[in-house]
UniProtKB/Swiss-Prot annotation:
Its EC number is 4.2.1.33. Signal peptide: none annotated. It catalyses: (2R,3S)-3-isopropylmalate = (2S)-2-isopropylmalate. Heterodimer of LeuC and LeuD. This is 3-isopropylmalate dehydratase large subunit. GO terms for molecular function: 3-isopropylmalate dehydratase activity; 4 iron, 4 sulfur cluster binding; metal ion binding. Belongs to the aconitase/IPM isomerase family. LeuC type 1 subfamily. Catalyzes the isomerization between 2-isopropylmalate and 3-isopropylmalate, via the formation of 2-isopropylmaleate. Pathway: Amino-acid biosynthesis; L-leucine biosynthesis; L-leucine from 3-methyl-2-oxobutanoate: step 2/4. The keyword Cell cycle does not apply.
Amino acid sequence: MGGARKPRTLAEKVWDDHVVVAGQGYHQDRGPDLIYIDLHLVHEVTSPQAFDGLRLAGRWVRRPDLTVATEDHNVPTVDIDKPIADPVSRIQVETLRRNCAEFGVRLHPMGDIEQGIVHVVGPQLGLTQPGMTIVCGDSHTSTHGAFGAIAMGIGTSEIEHVLATQTLPLRPFKTMAVTVDGRLPAGVTAKDIILALIAKIGTGGGQGYVLEYRGSVIESMSMEGRMTICNMSIEAGARAGMVAPDETTYEFLRDRPHAPTGKQWDAAVAYWQQLRTDDDAVFDTEVYLDATSLSPFVTWGTNPGQGVPLAASVPDPELMIDDVARQAAEKALAYMDLRPGTPMRDIAVDAVFVGSCTNGRIEDLRLVADVLRGHKVADGVRMLIVPGSMRVRAQAEAEGLGEIFITAGAQWRQPGCSMCLGMNPDQLAPGERCAATSNRNFEGRQGKGGRTHLVSPAVAAATAVRGTFSAPADLN
């Protein structure tokens, strides 16, 4: 008889439930496990070569019922009833449509009520569920970990492997507990928490880990907030981020199109309730954040870890002890055209972008509307508000949010990845500075020569009104 099973973390439980064939060997010499994949999400940018590989090998999609595609990265956010102007974008979208038709994959194209950013669509349809393994050819697949799933981005060759076999060979990841306790101050959001965490541990601090977010602040957070935090786990270098499912999770999923019903719902919840880290389980490492000490955050550099509280100033590289950090800061400040010691609140912006798979959900749009109500976007500032999906847009319209945005002088767009990345018409001009609710501030991310600062939706809205980096409290 075997001994009692050792206590396990949430990630280990989900992983163990999906091992088809265990890797051979021990410790460092152990081979990868073959992991079953419950849900495969597909979009137009990373899938064409994968479908070509299937075609050349004479294979088919093994589980089209577990594969869902949507158009998001390249799609325009205006005039969606007209042909896509950019030839490369048009070819990629048309190719996805042909591939999905040929291989029997469900697709939500532009204009479809269920179309939107892939990481918004999955949860809103109830496709994303606790205990699942979820993959997509996109870094921010970690978003779905907010439901207690192991969710990760994969490359094109791995996409082909999943399409053909519904499995992936993977080595187990290390585990990191990120505990956020304390009382979250007014005006501080999930986006501020994750930006503060990345600033604390660095963009490589989570490399090789699955991060499990825990603590009273996470437990009291909405699903939208949890998705924001898990979404940016990859920006700390992590493979995935997770939150244990609870009543908040169940209520979000209840009655969604693909959620279980009746006795199947009861059985699913009974299983989901087991998806918690055992009391005696040991993480490979642990990190703590005191929420009470947090404040609105803004990045100043060219990676998500180069951030400071809004009340702070641009840091001085000369005061940095680490040579690598100092050189990176000097390079970033040169690109961003910023001087050390400049108060963040004194930095003017040319554009404000609200949207993306990080902050394009209805809760985010409500926050923005609350700030914009009764105000106008500052002269010389261009503000784009892009819902994460057609469903989000419809709900925002029903709640009167679109009217608030337009009255304030913002552009209220159709769904898509939009200005998060320069793969569609929504781009910055060289030298333009943008406050963005997206997830990456790399050089040229929003367009060649564009300068991106990552902020929360609330800070984005206040910044649009004042024209310089601001919090809602600054408008009073």
